[in-house]
Amino acid sequence: MFELNNFDAIQIGLASPEQIRQWSRGEVKKPETINYRTLKPERDGLFCERIFGPMKDWECHCGKYKRVRYKGIVCDRCGVEVTKAKVRRERMGHIELAAPVSHIWYFKGIPSRMGLILDMSPRALEKVLYFASYIVIDPKETPLLKKQLLNEKEYREAVDKYGDESFVAGMGAEAIQDLLNEIDLVTSSKELKEELKQSSGQKKVRIIRRLEVVESFRKSGNDPQWMVINVIPVIPPDLRPMVQLDGGRFATSDLNDLYRRVINRNNRLKKLLDLGAPDIIVRNEKRMLQEAVDALIDNGRRGRPVTGPGNRPLKSLSDMLKGKQGRFRQNLLGKRVDYSGRSVIVVGPELKMYQCGLPKEMAIELFKPFVMKKLVQDGIAHNIKSAKRMVERVLPQVWDVLEEVIADHPVLLNRAPTLHRLGIQAFQPVLVEGRAIKLHPLACTAYNADFDGDQMAVHLPLSVEAQAEARFLMLAATNILKPSDGKPVCVPTQDMILGSYYLTMDKNGAKGDGMTFSSKDEAIMAYEVKEIDIHAQINVRMFREVDGELKSKIIKTTVGKIIFNESIPQNLGLVNRENEEESFNLEVDFLATKKSLGKIIDQCYMKHGPVKTSIMLDNIKALGYHYSSIGAVTVASSDIIVPKVKYDLLKEADETIEKIEKMYKRGFISDEERYERVIEKWTQTTEDVANALMDSLDKFNPIYMMADSGARGSKSQIKQLAGMRGLMASPSGKIIELPIRASFKEGLDVIEYFLSTHGARKGNADTALKTADSGYLTRRLVDVSQDVIVREEDCGTDEGIFVSEIKEGNEVIEELRERLIGRYTAEDIVDPETGDVLHPKNEYMDPYAADKIVSAGIKKVKIRSVFTCKCKVGVCARCYGMNMATAKKIDIGEAVGIIAAQSIGEPGTQLTMRTFHTGGVAGADITQGLPRVEELFEARKPKGLAIVSEIAGTARIEETKKKRTVIVMGADGEERSYDIPFGSRLRVNESDYVEAGDEITEGSVNPHDIMSIKGIDGARRYLLSEVQKVYRLQGVDINDKHLEVVVRQMTRKIKIVDSGDTDLLPGTMIDMFDFYEENARVREFGGEEAKGEQTLLGITKAALATDSFLSAASFQETTRVLTEAAIKGKVDPLVGLKENVIIGKLIPAGTGMMRYRSLKVETDSELVEETIGETVEE
């Protein structure tokens, strides 16, 4: 049986006129649509029922046949087939054109395919197509040239001179069709290949482009003359509907207008041809027909667009596909789904980690079919119809059934914007009163949700498989780690931290200080009867079993710490339990701040896995809320204490600045130096005031507690409240040298207030711009890496990359340990001192192995990397390493490309927009933040280019009055000199050794330059470390492997330089694995291999260069992608995720992979019988 959804690939091509007629159910002859009185479609019109099918189910046009029993009969009066009205969504019609017209995509696109295949310029082509010039089709004996253009006057003269029959010339699409018809693709291809060998420069480029088009037609089996249309397909009427509005007027799709113009002009042309009208009139009509068809296919591509009422350009067929509102992005990639609801969220502190509160009204609507089925099953209702009535009337017994149905049926909660995969998680629903969804407070961080009016959507997984996946893979309790860096995302926040912090504080001289208790329980009891304070330092005897015998020891602690440790497993490895002295201590014997809580959760996850961790998190949550209420930490203005030292520090600063000004006035220092020193001094003073302030605050000061615990606020905010606001930036980003001396407690004067407003306003503007930019970056990243999926266990490569710590100047940005954890080694790691193998090749490195390698003093390690993976589609599990979200080895089928894109895109909003103005760099500022990331991923030439050394050697600096020059002397005596522009800072000193590709001046490097000097590996390493620098400086951790996935996609293509004996065309881009395969094929029969150079594409270019035309067309430049794909007769192999979503198949990742889909469960009957037999005997 042929199943519609069961196919492996999809191909696109040019449609021949025969094919179009075959699709069609009849010719549309009249421009009429619907009769406005009877509201029935006109016969042979654009909505004709005879062609497209009946408007109403099982009812013909004239009403002779009604009811389903006449199914399939064609009415003898009106000719309409009695069938479902749904066929009006799939049946097509056609229009027979009286004169051929050209297809605007192939004539007007860049490059013009029609122009290339005919070897004509698009301008000449336009003159012919739009009846401005004649073209010579066959010169016969005359001295005219083939394809020569003649204007009206020249044509007349030629006819007079040589006679009417002596040559053939024509105009319009007919002439072009004749020329296209004459082309012999095989000979053209051979001729062009010969020409290619002799030519060079611009001519060569043109020949390569022509050859590409000719080869596309030759290989795909498309006929070039099909670029000229004789028959136009008419799309089904329900896809271009016409509906009646309240006032009796009609609203219609723009396509109907465009089709109507084509039909009108076509019919008029037919009439003129029948009448034998003069040539000039016919010609004008043909030109109008050509323009009407152009507008229908792509309105506005040539000339002024056809406008509807109110000067609005009409939406043509191309516009239906393009852009965010087009078919691809609006209906195919994102659909509205049934079984969903949305509501406001409120906090649910009483919920367990895996639960959410679902309003009753919403639940009954969502679970309606399930409730109805259960009612019938339990015999409460007799049939489905009465069950439906019961649910709609909301009878009391329905609620009981709902409770049962809901019991183990997870729901998905989603909050827009869904920036990473933690934006959709599964929860076990609990019915609640009211109309708001209740959300667990620990799930807020992942969703980035707060309760100031946020809304969330609920979706219901229907099938058993979907429910299983939701429960095992998406349940909130299992999503504890962040996929981007493997750190816990469910860290307690705000009140929970504050409560835990309060609980683990200690206070000298509190009530009951120094008392001793015989056990934990006695100490807790003493606290409950208010004999001792929760922060009092007391002595408690602790018991634990060592080798089967009970031992005890008195330790110093507080009741708060005892209570806090009740909910924490006592074997997280924070205390060395082997050492007898320490082994009785509490696991958490320190202040619980946001950082330390994160560490506790991390340890718990590594030791005990997700289930225990989620239980511990719920306990911490309950404790935190309880004790933050008991602690009752509040803020009053009396808590903001201005330190006494402040005024002394300010005075001292003023004196220093006076000295600096004096030096400047005497000409010892330049203005720039003065500015820098002033800024430096004020920065230092502000810092000193802040430090003095933090030292002077009591540790029970509520503001200090909030900031120190990490619950809310930061040191810099306290500095502004009680210290001084410090330096401000002007709107341009330059720092103003007058600081704000006041704090908010003392109050700002008018000038200070005015200076403050700059920053605030710029901040708001930046945030708005940043969100859009960040979203667009994520979209491009997803598009470039969406088809990267873990496809196999091991690709068997011996290659890898060397990693060492990433530095910015002297500051370590990413440690080596962090780069090793969860990766596989690419060679044996040998201890440099003893020569022992510390870690064998191709083995997984856990944190312990990484520590061992780093502590042995090894600075550079060769690891398996996505860069060097030999997997043709996707990557292999060994080259990828650990799954950051589970801290285990990655599973086959994981969509690592999407995860990489989300991990890089999600923190995009946190990156600042600012381009920083660093003093002293003349002219060009160094871009930072989001624009810098974008610049790197798009592989653009950066602003503020650095000068790069092309060779390795020793640097020498020569200064003359006019300029500075750096000369690099290579080991082999080769010299390169670089002129340094005025105002640039040097990065090298006299007689420094520089490597090839090192920067000589400050600034950013063009990645393409690095590629030409250091090769593809150098470029990849550069991109990786540069992107890491931007993110790390903002305090965002992203694991290397995510960046590797994207950078690998940017460097996959090879540009053919010389084709050798292969079928590859010079100048074309090809996937590197296809390139190696083709070369291997040629090598087998001893031919000459092709030569190519690796290219670095920006993410937009790389996304458009994918093998899948569906994915590329739905990304950007839809018409261009489809034009090219149609000419090449491209086949989309459906390997990525996007193309499968578009055609409605399961995505080939996770359980949708073929290896999982093709599993069959078979029972071995003998085995079953044996087991049954054994059970019976027992």
Curated annotation (Swiss-Prot):
Q: Which GO terms describe its cellular component?
A: DNA-directed RNA polymerase complex
Write down how the cofactor binds this protein: Binds 1 Mg(2+) ion per subunit. Binds 2 Zn(2+) ions per subunit.
Q: Where does Zn(2+) 1 bind?
A: 60, 62, 75, 78
**Protein EC:** 2.7.7.6
An example molecular function term from Gene Ontology annotations = DNA binding
Cofactor dependence is on: Mg(2+); Zn(2+)
Primary enzyme class: transferase
Record: residues binding Zn(2+) 2: 795, 869, 876, 879
The UniProt function text for this chain reads: DNA-dependent RNA polymerase catalyzes the transcription of DNA into RNA using the four ribonucleoside triphosphates as substrates.
Which HAMAP family does the annotation name? RNApol_bact_RpoC
Family as reported in the entry's similarity comment: Belongs to the RNA polymerase beta' chain family.
Give the record's subunit note: The RNAP catalytic core consists of 2 alpha, 1 beta, 1 beta' and 1 omega subunit. When a sigma factor is associated with the core the holoenzyme is formed, which can initiate transcription.
PANTHER family the record matches: DNA-DIRECTED RNA POLYMERASE, DNA-DIRECTED RNA POLYMERASE SUBUNIT BETA
Q: What is this protein called?
A: DNA-directed RNA polymerase subunit beta'
Species source reads Clostridium beijerinckii (strain ATCC 51743 / NCIMB 8052) (Clostridium acetobutylicum)
Q: What's the source species' lineage?
A: Bacteria, Bacillati, Bacillota, Clostridia, Eubacteriales
